[in-house]
């Protein structure tokens, strides 16, 4: 397998742009090609949904034409919000196999011209249909994961909010030093806590913005000063209700183990990382899934300053998706651009430690198609001979039948596994909207919409019903539980009386 290097990179400023999607791609490509003298043999383009965002199809051919590269093979790659990383990995394989020597990788999206509700609807298209039927959005599902994480690792709600605030403040501070970032200013604690709730416990500053932008990387078989040492991809269930864990993304763990295995290193040899922080808690979970911190300890690393720019392991020194912006198809490529610059000493401010090796982690959908890339300086020496991690295997699940894809009638009662109150709702749903993942009496997990927003708590018992294919729940009140207990007791009284009478009769007979 041939070594794969990075010859050049380029990126537009992220944010709200008057340029078309094609113009953004061309600007990024022109910047990446400006400092290299290679003949591009193929184009790999990562973009999530130009058909709905900008009404454009056949985008790969359009970009090739606009760049004056007609005749050059052009391929569009899509894996939701990890599309840019997917394009990079596809190009890596093409060079590593020896089929091409020089490939231009592009990632981009144009989103800001649409309303927030329209963009939310398009982005929600990557999540499970049944969960969408109840009004779930990406933010709502991220919030439900956050609430479950808080409960599992026994972090109080107020404590968790302070941790998430620290992540947001850190990334906005980092982004304020990045000329390509959408947000050029920091965020204060006061601003964070006064920002509106999007989906409890997530606030506005916990969510990445809607953005326009593009990024480009030229991959080559010719030696340069930065190489791609390892790559990995993993997939996981699309729906939240079918997951083995609500506090970790198995797709990231699989991808990370494969990348570490290919690179022949362990997580301890990574100097910094750019991770997919579309929501602040996802940064914390990603650092655990990448093996930097034990499960349930990532939030402590934030609290102790370990992930800050001057910490032991800086996370998102560019500002991440949270501050740099998140034009969904561009983000996976932009992460590699940022790492390339920092490994070459071209990013400010400099990290306090010498940097030789870094990781990028890109998430597709709700963690259902994730990519990990390890980049290193070509002259980097290994600090130790630690054994590489072995790729984790994932046992295939049985294929879902047509019957499984149709929501079945839930049993009448269940228990809340996790929940959120959504304040920024999709079209057709009024805020505030209570959503919960409920385990019914048959042991099945169901996404359900609440009749009201009061008394929500993990473990609380609820009534379930289904209307037009959508599930609804009502929290059992304390009075209801008392009444049910009395009914059960009253139902047992006749049998108790009969048993007592029978016992007395036997005694008399004796």
Summary of predicted features, one role per range:
Residues 1-82, 90, 149-163, 167, ...:
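Conserved active-site "lid/cap" helical segment
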Residues 78-109, 139-178, 217-222, 324-347:
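Active-site-proximal alpha-helical scaffold in enzymes
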Residues 1-22, 27, 129-132, 152, ...:
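Condensing-enzyme catalytic core mediating Claisen C-C bond formation in acyl metabolism
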Residues 53-58, 241-244, 277-299, 327, ...:
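Short glycine/threonine-rich loop-to-helix capping motif typified by GTGT followed
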């Amino acid at each position: 397998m041939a070594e794969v290097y990075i010859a050049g990179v380029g990126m537009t400023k992220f944010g709200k742009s008057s340029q078309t999607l094609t113009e953004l791609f061309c600007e990024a490509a022109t910047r990446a090609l400006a400092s290299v003298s290679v003949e591009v043999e193929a184009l790999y383009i990562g973009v999530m949904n130009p058909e709905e965002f900008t009404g454009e199809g056949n985008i790969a051919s359009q970009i090739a034409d606009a760049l004056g590269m007609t005749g050059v093979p052009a391929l569009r790659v899509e894996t939701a919000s990890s599309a840019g990383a997917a394009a990079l990995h596809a190009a890596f394989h093409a060079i590593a196999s020896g089929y091409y020597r020089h490939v231009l990788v592009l990632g981009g999206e144009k989103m800001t011209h649409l309303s927030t509700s329209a963009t939310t609807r398009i982005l929600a298209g990557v999540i499970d249909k049944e969960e969408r039927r109840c009004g779930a959005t990406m933010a709502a599902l991220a919030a439900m994961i956050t609430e479950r994480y808080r409960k599992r690792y026994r972090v109080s709600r107020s404590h968790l909010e302070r941790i998430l605030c620290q992540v947001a403040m850190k990334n906005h501070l980092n982004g304020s030093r990045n000329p390509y970032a959408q947000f050029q200013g920091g965020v204060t604690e006061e601003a964070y806590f006064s920002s509106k709730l999007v989906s409890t416990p997530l606030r506005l500053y916990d969510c990445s913005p809607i953005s326009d932008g593009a990024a480009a990387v030229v991959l080559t078989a010719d030696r340069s000063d930065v190489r791609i040492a390892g790559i990995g991809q993993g997939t996981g269930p699309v729906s939240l209700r079918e997951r083995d864990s609500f506090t970790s993304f198995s797709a990231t763990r699989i991808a990370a183990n494969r990348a570490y295995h290919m690179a022949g290193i362990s997580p301890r040899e990574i100097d910094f990382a750019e991770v997919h922080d579309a929501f602040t808690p996802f940064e914390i979970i990603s650092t655990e899934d990448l093996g930097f911190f034990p499960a349930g300890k990532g939030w402590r690393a934030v609290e102790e300053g370990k992930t800050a720019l001057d910490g032991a392991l800086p996370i998102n020194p560019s500002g991440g998706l949270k501050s740099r912006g998140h034009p969904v198809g561009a983000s996976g490529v932009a992460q590699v651009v940022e790492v390339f610059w920092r490994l070459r000493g071209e990013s400010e401010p400099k990290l306090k430690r010498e940097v030789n090796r870094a990781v990028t982690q890109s998430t597709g959908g709700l963690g259902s198609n994730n990519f990990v890339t390890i980049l290193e300086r070509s002259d980097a020496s290994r600090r130790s001979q630690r054994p590489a991690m072995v790729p984790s295997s994932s046992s295939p699940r049985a294929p879902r039948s047509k019957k499984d894809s149709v929501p079945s009638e839930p049993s009448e009662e269940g228990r809340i596994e996790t929940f959120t109150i959504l304040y920024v709702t999709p079209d057709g749903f009024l805020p505030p909207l209570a959503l919960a993942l409920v385990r019914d009496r048959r042991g099945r997990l169901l996404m359900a919409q609440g009749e009201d927003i009061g008394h929500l708590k993990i473990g609380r018992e609820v009534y379930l019903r289904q209307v037009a294919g959508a599930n609804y729940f009502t929290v059992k009140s304390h009075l209801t539980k008392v009444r049910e207990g009395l009914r059960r007791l009253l139902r047992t009284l006749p049998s108790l009386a009969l048993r007592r009478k029978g016992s007395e009769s036997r005694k008399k007979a004796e």
